[in-house]
Amino acid sequence: MTMRSSSPSSSSSYSLAFTSLSNRLETIFKKASELCTLCDIEACVIYYGPDGELKTWPKEKEKVRDIALRYSLLNEALRRKKSVNLHGFLNKKKNKGLKNPNKKMKTSLKNVNILKYPLADHYPPDQVSPLIQSLELHVSKFQERLRFLESQKQNQTKPDHQSLTPSSLNHYTQSLNPSQFSLFMYNHGDNTLSQIPVSASNFNQDYFSALLEESELKNQLMKPEICGYDQNQNMSMGDITNNKFQDPCVSNKEAVQESVNNFGLNQLMYKEFYGCDQNMSMGNINSNSFQNPCVSNTQHYSAVEESVKNPWLNQLMQNELYGYGYAGFC
C-alpha cells in the first residue's frame, strides 16, 4: 500500500521538474540569442536531457560543431578567463566586498511607493484640503521672496547719481521752515521797507532772484562801500539822540523819520547804516551826543528817540547788541 501511494506522488514531482526544466531551457536559448545579437559574438548551447536527448542552439549542427571545435583548441587559461558558474560568481562577489571594507554601498532613502505613485493618492479625502493649503502657503512665500530678490537686483543695477525723486524733494522742502526766514523789500522811491511772507513752496532760486531784481537789494548792499565806512567800526550808543547825527547817504529827513518807526528798517539801520557790533554800550542811550555820518539832518532826531523809547524795540536792540545773535533777522 505504501509503495503504491508513493508512486503517484513521485511521478507528479518528476513531471513538475521536467516542466520546469523545459521552461528554463527555452529561457536559456533565448538569452543566448540575445547575447549574439547585442554583443555581436558567436555563442552556442548544447543540452542533454535526462533521457539522453540532444538539443542545441542554434539548431544547425554544423555551426554548433564549428564553435565547439574552436573552443576546445583554446588553452586552459583562456578557457577559464571569463568562465563562471554559480559558486564562482558568489565567491567573486564575496571577495570583492572583503577587499574594500570601507566602501559604502549606495542606498536610496526614498520610498519605492512614492516613486511609483503620486503623493496625493495615499492621503484620505479629509487630509487633501489641508495639504493643498500648506502647499499654497509655501508657494506664496516663495513668490514673495522672488519679488524681493528681483527688486533688490534692480536697485543694485541703478546708478548712484540719480536725480532727486519728488518724495525726496518734498522732504527737503519741508525741512525749510518758513518761520525761520524773513524777507524784506526796500523801495527807493518812497524810502519804505515792507516785509514779504515767504513760504517753503515759493522759496526757490528763481523767485528769490526776481525779488532781488525788483527791490534792488543788490544796490542797497553796495551802499556801505560807496559811503566810505565799514561795518566793523565800534560806535557808542550813548550818542544816539545827539543833534549832530548826520549821514551823507540819507538826504530826505521825512523818509528817515518814517523808516525809523518801521520795525524792519530798524533792523536794516542797525546792520547797514550804523555798522555797530555786539560790543556796544547801552549806558548813554538817551544822551544828546550821538553822532552818525549817515544822517544829514540834526533837527529830526525825535523819531529816533521815539523808537528807542519803544520797549519792544529796546528788547530787540538788546538782543542784537548783547550778543544774542542775528538768526531771527536773516
Curated annotation (Swiss-Prot):
Protein's UniProt name: Agamous-like MADS-box protein AGL75
Subunit annotation: Interacts with MEE14/CBP1.
Compartment list: Nucleus
Keywords annotated in UniProt: DNA-binding, Nucleus, Transcription, Transcription regulation
Domain (MADS-box) ranges: 19-61
GO terms classed as biological process: positive regulation of transcription by RNA polymerase II
A GO CC annotation given for this chain: nucleus
Source superkingdom: Eukaryota
GO molecular function: cis-regulatory region sequence-specific DNA binding; DNA-binding transcription factor activity; DNA-binding transcription factor activity, RNA polymerase II-specific; protein dimerization activity
SUPFAM superfamilies: SRF-like (SSF55455)
SMART domains according to UniProt: MADS
Principal location listed in the UniProt entry: nucleus
One Pfam match: SRF-TF
Stored CDD domains: MADS_SRF_like
Known function: Probable transcription factor that may function in the maintenance of the proper function of the central cell in pollen tube attraction.
